[in-house]
Amino acid sequence: MMRIALFLLTNLAVMLVFGLVLSLTGIQSSSVQGLMIMAGLFGFGGAFVSLLMSKWMALRSVGGEVIERPRNETEYWLLETVRRQSQQVGIAMPQVAIYQAPDINAFATGARRDASLVAVSTGLLQNMSRDEAEAVIAHEISHVANGDMVTMTLIQGVVNTFVIFISRLIAQIAAGFLSGDRDGESNSPGNPMVYFAVSMVLELVFGILASIITMWFSRHREFHADAGSAKLVGREKMIAALQRLKTSYEPQEAGSMMAFCINGKSKTFSELFMSHPPLDKRIEALRSGQYLK
């Protein structure tokens, strides 16, 4: 949940910075078409910047260490498991990292299917059986194979575009109204302070509301990743892994952008703002075979 939240906050920060630069430099769009083009460039730009930086940010945020050569039997097993599953789904071998954390957790990130990263916590390796850990790894490999990183980036780009467009359109109307240009015929954006204040507040508010859409897609992809894991290692192993997660506690380590975690418990947000479905729903979906068809 933290990783997705930070990805959204990064996009929001990029939009706010772009908006600040435009307002300070006096660059404003005088037409709806121009505003839409600007919103698209900045909206998708923020999302793709986050995607391109995702591996670096992920490793930096959790203090992960990429395994170059296995130093013990656990690291050897982890590399071989990732290699075998990658071959099964037809993707290049991802980088594999381990990070120090007591929580049972793992994530996948990266800009491309064939240039990805899979990281697991020491808590996962210490507290899960090999079968359960294998299922979690298969879940992350399924995220990569399904192209979920790029899918979520495109969705975020569309959401960003509409947030910027609607916010600045309303801000331009409000600024023009207060400056006496109630017909919107002037090329001037109106009162620049009003324009800046309204656009920044609306981008923040609409960005938070738009995260509901992004979170819905994220939850949808989690069901498919669970199903992908079940196909790779067996349904019972994935169910066992999720049941083990029910006994774990909420992960607290710092997050990273565009990462897909296995641990989806949440105690502080309603389901609308959850990046993962409740664990009971994920287990039920696996038992019913809803996403295995």
Swiss-Prot record:
Q: Which InterPro entries match?
A: HtpX_protease, Pept_M48_protease_HtpX, Peptidase_M48
Enumerate the transmembrane spans.
Answer: 4-24, 34-54, 158-178, 193-213
Q: Which Pfam families match?
A: Peptidase_M48
Locate the residues binding Zn(2+): 139, 143, 222
Query: What are the names of the required cofactors?
Result: Zn(2+)
Q: Does the keyword Nucleotidyltransferase apply?
A: no
Q: Name the GO cellular-component terms.
A: plasma membrane
For this UniProt entry, the molecular function terms from Gene Ontology, in alphabetical order, are: metalloendopeptidase activity; zinc ion binding
Could you list this entry's UniProt keywords, alphabetically sorted: Cell inner membrane, Cell membrane, Hydrolase, Membrane, Metal-binding, Metalloprotease, Protease, Stress response, Transmembrane, Transmembrane helix, Zinc
Q: How does it sit in the membrane?
A: Multi-pass membrane protein
* Active site per database record: 140
PANTHER family named among the record's database cross-references: PROTEASE HTPX
Return the protein name: Protease HtpX
Name of the encoding gene: htpX
